[in-house]
Amino acid sequence: MQLNLGAIFLALLGVMATATSVLAEPHRHQGPIFDTRPSPFNPNQPRPGPIY
C-alpha cells in the first residue's frame, strides 16, 4: 500500500508541475510582438509613418 501511495504522489506531482508550466507559459509574452526586420513573409511589419 505504501508503494501505491508513493506512485500516486509522484504522478500527482508530475501533473502539477506540467500544469503550472503550461499555465505560466502565456504570461511571458505580453502584448503584440512587432518584428522590425524587412521581409516579404512578415505580417507584423510596422507601417512607415509620416516624416515630420
Curated annotation (Swiss-Prot):
UniProt keyword Signal, yes or no: yes
Cite the residue spans of the region called Disordered: 28-52
UniProt keyword terms in alphabetical order: Antibiotic, Antimicrobial, Fungicide, Immunity, Innate immunity, Secreted, Signal
What is one GO cellular-component annotation here?
A: extracellular region
Localization of this protein = Secreted
Tell me yes or no: is Metal-binding among this UniProt entry's keywords: no
Tissue specificity field? Hemolymph (at protein level). Highest expression in fat body.
Q: Which domain of life is it from?
A: Eukaryota
Write out the biased-composition intervals (Pro residues): 40-52
Cite the propeptide residues by number.
Answer: 25-26
Q: Which Pfam families match?
A: Antimicrobial10
Variant or mutagenesis effect after changing residue 19 to T: In strain: 2CPA51
User: Which InterPro entries does this UniProt record tie to the protein?
Assistant: Mtk (IPR012513)
User: What inducers act on this gene?
Assistant: By bacterial infection (at protein level). Up-regulated in hemolymph 6 hours after immune challenge, levels of expression increase for first 24 hours and persist for the following two weeks (at protein level).
**A biological-process GO annotation:** response to wounding
Span of the secretion signal? 1-24
Q: What does this protein do?
A: Potent antifungal and antibacterial activity against Gram-positive bacteria.
Q: What is the designated name of this protein? A: Metchnikowin
